[in-house]
């Protein structure tokens, strides 16, 4: 299938709107991607004609809704090449998935004197849950430091592991720098030391294929809303043997086998024992539509188009005076920058006046900001629906801001 950005853009209604009298150039998909009509329509159709509470219902609507939900679990397992659909837990998003692991697996396996390894480029969602776990049990949090070019100091990694290392929690792709970490060698090293590996895939799954079996990671987590799906839904993959050993972290309906006031409660099997309460069934249906949409386009086709667009953007941005770019030349999805000494919020506000949407702030990565000694950065993110013309508008906008502000 030949990739056509014009055909893709036609599927996204919001891309036809104007902002401040100018065509919208949406360069903020790393925060949250826009939704194609196929996703919007699938979720709307479910609520119009197919909605019912899932699980245990004997009536037709409930049975059909349950089947649709479980079919999405199967589709998601194929999307990341899991061995079984029962290795996938529906979660609200990447943040909840990481917290689930920290509170279930972590509480059961991390003890006083143990340690967990993260990196300096992590999103707060892959820092704070581990800080909280370490504080609860008396464990140590160790950090892989950054290089100035936005890559990790991988030569330090072997020195961080020891017999007390229980987990390496690492991002697949940095949400600020676009750095893609060499997971294969990092996971191999972790397993050689008897540690498990959790991968934050929030910024990876929309850019190229992910194969969790080939990676051999123990946990992999991502969100639907960055993958052109709805908010409030995500996927946590856990190797089956691990998942079956993990206790539930939330109690309620749907995750029990039996409940007795005198004899206590027993749990249903995984993954359902991690899905307490009424699920976000509409969001799950929308996620399924997003996975189907992206798969039909072909992730390899998307990757090729986006990489060409990224190379073009980096080459054009080199012509902007006083522009500081952060991150390595080979990157995925995002371009973080500052313009002279101007605050990122000011630059972002000017760009918004030109109809260009970028993200400004610390991007939930304060330790990374501290490393670069800046309070904030602007971040333009490139998705499969962005164009060379939108990159040109960004470059022109930054040149105009430089002339205005000096």
Swiss-Prot record:
It catalyses: (sulfur carrier)-H + L-cysteine = (sulfur carrier)-SH + L-alanine; L-selenocysteine + AH2 = hydrogenselenide + L-alanine + A + H(+). One of its GO terms (molecular function) is cysteine desulfurase activity. The modification N6-(pyridoxal phosphate)lysine is found at residue 226. Pathway: Cofactor biosynthesis; iron-sulfur cluster biosynthesis. InterPro entries: Aminotrans_V_dom, Aminotrans_V_PyrdxlP_BS, Cys_dSase_SufS, PyrdxlP-dep_Trfase, PyrdxlP-dep_Trfase_major, PyrdxlP-dep_Trfase_small. Its EC number is 2.8.1.7, 4.4.1.16. Its cofactor is pyridoxal 5'-phosphate. Cysteine desulfurases mobilize the sulfur from L-cysteine to yield L-alanine, an essential step in sulfur metabolism for biosynthesis of a variety of sulfur-containing biomolecules. Component of the suf operon, which is activated and required under specific conditions such as oxidative stress and iron limitation. Acts as a potent selenocysteine lyase in vitro, that mobilizes selenium from L-selenocysteine. Selenocysteine lyase activity is however unsure in vivo. It is found in: Cytoplasm. GO terms for biological process: cysteine metabolic process. It comes from the Bacteria. It holds the Pfam family Aminotran_5. Belongs to the class-V pyridoxal-phosphate-dependent aminotransferase family. Csd subfamily. This is Cysteine desulfurase. Homodimer. Interacts with SufE and the SufBCD complex composed of SufB, SufC and SufD. The interaction with SufE is required to mediate the direct transfer of the sulfur atom from the S-sulfanylcysteine. Its main location: cytoplasm. The keyword Coiled coil does not apply. The active site is at residue 364. The gene is sufS. It comes from Escherichia coli O127:H6 (strain E2348/69 / EPEC). One of its GO terms (cellular component) is cytoplasm. Keywords: Cytoplasm, Lyase, Pyridoxal phosphate, Transferase.
């Amino acid at each position: 299938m030949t990739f056509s950005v014009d055909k893709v853009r036609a599927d996204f209604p919001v891309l036809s709107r104007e902002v401040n009298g100018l065509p919208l150039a949406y360069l903020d998909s790393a925060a949250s991607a826009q939704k194609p009509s196929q996703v919007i329509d699938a979720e709307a159709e479910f609520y119009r004609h197919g909605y019912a509470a899932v699980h245990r219902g004997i009536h037709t609507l409930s049975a059909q809704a349950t089947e649709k939900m479980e079919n999405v679990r199967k589709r998601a397992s194929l999307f990341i090449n899991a061995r079984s659909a029962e290795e996938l837990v529906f979660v609200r998003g990447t943040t909840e998935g990481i917290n689930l692991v920290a509170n279930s697996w972590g509480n059961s396996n991390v003890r006083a004197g143990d340690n967990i390894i993260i990196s300096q480029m992590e999103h707060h969602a892959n820092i704070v849950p581990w800080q909280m776990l370490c504080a609860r049990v008396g464990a140590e949090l160790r950090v892989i430091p950054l290089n100035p070019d936005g890559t990790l100091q991988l030569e330090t990694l072997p020195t961080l592991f020891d017999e007390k290392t229980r987990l390496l929690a690492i991002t697949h792709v940095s949400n600020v720098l676009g750095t893609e970490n060499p997971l294969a060698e990092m996971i191999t090293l972790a397993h050689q030391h008897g540690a498990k590996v959790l991968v934050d895939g929030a910024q990876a799954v929309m850019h190229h294929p992910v194969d969790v079996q080939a990676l051999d990671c123990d946990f992999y987590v991502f969100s639907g809303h960055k993958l052109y799906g709805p908010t409030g839904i995500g996927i946590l993959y856990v190797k089956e043997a691990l998942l079956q050993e993990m206790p539930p972290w939330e109690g309620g309906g749907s995750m029990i086998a039996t409940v007795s006031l005198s004899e206590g409660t027993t749990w249903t099997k995984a993954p359902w024992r991690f899905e307490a309460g009424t699920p976000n069934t509409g969001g799950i249906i929308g996620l399924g539509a997003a996975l189907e949409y992206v798969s039909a386009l072909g992730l390899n086709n998307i990757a090729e188009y986006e990489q060409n667009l990224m190379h073009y953007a980096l080459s054009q941005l080199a012509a902007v005076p006083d522009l500081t770019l952060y991150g390595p030349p080979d990157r995925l999805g995002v371009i973080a920058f500052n313009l002279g000494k101007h605050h990122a919020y000011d630059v972002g506000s000017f760009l918004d006046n030109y109809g260009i949407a970028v993200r400004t702030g610390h991007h939930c990565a304060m330790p990374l900001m501290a490393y670069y000694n800046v309070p904030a950065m602007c971040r333009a993110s490139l998705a499969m629906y962005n164009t060379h013309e939108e990159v040109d508008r960004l470059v022109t906008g930054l040149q105009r801001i430089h002339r205005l502000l000096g």
